[in-house]
């Protein structure tokens, strides 16, 4: 919220509380390092809040990078972590280039398909700068954040035809199609799909965690 990204702030608090009550999130779990070397680590979040595990992972990556010049930490068994850019900026504040990403549940279609095929997996980077806080980018691989579609539905407003498709894969301006039967449109068509797949490989496969295809 402080960064102006209201779709990823306190607006999600009720959802986090419900998920905790339903057993999908542990409010007492602590991230555990399963395996590590001087410049890498594999972390199990044990279903803790994504903010807890992701902050732990980025701080650990920065600690290792201070010694080795570069480091990678991957996380499995985590939950929604909010805005990806927050964690990238943790590295920038320590004088480093930070990259953060996460795969999410399927909510986006891909060219030539119908329905939700893959997540709109967010990716962010931040680099320290002299005249500004950081050189910074935080984007999902859909044309717009899914929460903006949901907000438009609550407000009864139409949306641009580039945001979602209906159950037949046809672009629509009616937000009521999502998420019950429609899907998000990928940013720049196959390009957004390709980048979402990269995040899937690095976040889900590399960590040994869940992927969009885990339930198939």
Residue locations for each model-derived region?
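Oxyanion-binding "anion nests"
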Residues: 171-211
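Predominant activation on well-ordered alpha-helical scaffold segments within soluble catalytic domains
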Residues: 14-18, 59-62, 89-92, 126, ...
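A generic, well-ordered mixed alpha/beta core segment in the N-terminal half of proteins
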Residues: 38-130
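Phosphate/diphosphate-binding glycine-rich loops and adjacent basic-rich segments that engage nucleotide
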Residues: 108-177
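Conserved active-site and cofactor/substrate-binding residues in soluble primary-metabolism enzymes
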Residues: 8-15, 52-56, 60, 82, ...
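Generic secondary-structure signature for well-ordered alpha-helical cores
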Residues: 1-5, 18-25, 63-67, 93-97, ...
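Catalytic-core signal marking the mid-to-C-terminal active-site face
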Residues: 213-216
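Active-site cofactor/substrate anionic-group-binding motifs, chiefly glycine-
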Residues: 8-62
């Amino acid at each position: 919220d402080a960064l102006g990204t209201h779709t990823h702030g306190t607006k999600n608090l009720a959802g986090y509380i419900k998920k905790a009550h339903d057993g999908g999130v542990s409010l007492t779990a602590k991230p555990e390092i399963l395996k590590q070397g001087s410049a890498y680590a594999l972390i199990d979040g044990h279903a803790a809040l994504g903010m807890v595990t992701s902050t732990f992972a980025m701080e650990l990556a920065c600690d290792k990078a201070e010694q080795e010049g570069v480091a990678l930490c991957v996380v499995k068994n985590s939950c929604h972590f909010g805005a990806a850019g927050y964690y990238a900026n943790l590295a920038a504040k320590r004088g480093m280039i930070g990259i953060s990403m996460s795969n999410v549940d399927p909510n986006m279609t891909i060219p030539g398909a119908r329905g939700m095929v893959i997540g709109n997996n967010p990716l962010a980077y931040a680099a320290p700068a002299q005249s500004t806080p950081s050189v910074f980018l935080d984007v999902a691989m859909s044309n717009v954040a899914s929460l903006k579609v949901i907000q438009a539905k609550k407000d009864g407003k139409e949306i641009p035809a580039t945001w979602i498709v209906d159950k037949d894969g046809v672009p629509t301006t009616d937000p009521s199609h999502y998420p019950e039967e429609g899907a998000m449109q990928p940013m720049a068509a196959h390009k957004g799909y390709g980048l979402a797949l990269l995040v899937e490989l690095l976040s889900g496969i590399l960590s040994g965690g869940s992927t969009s295809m885990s339930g198939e």
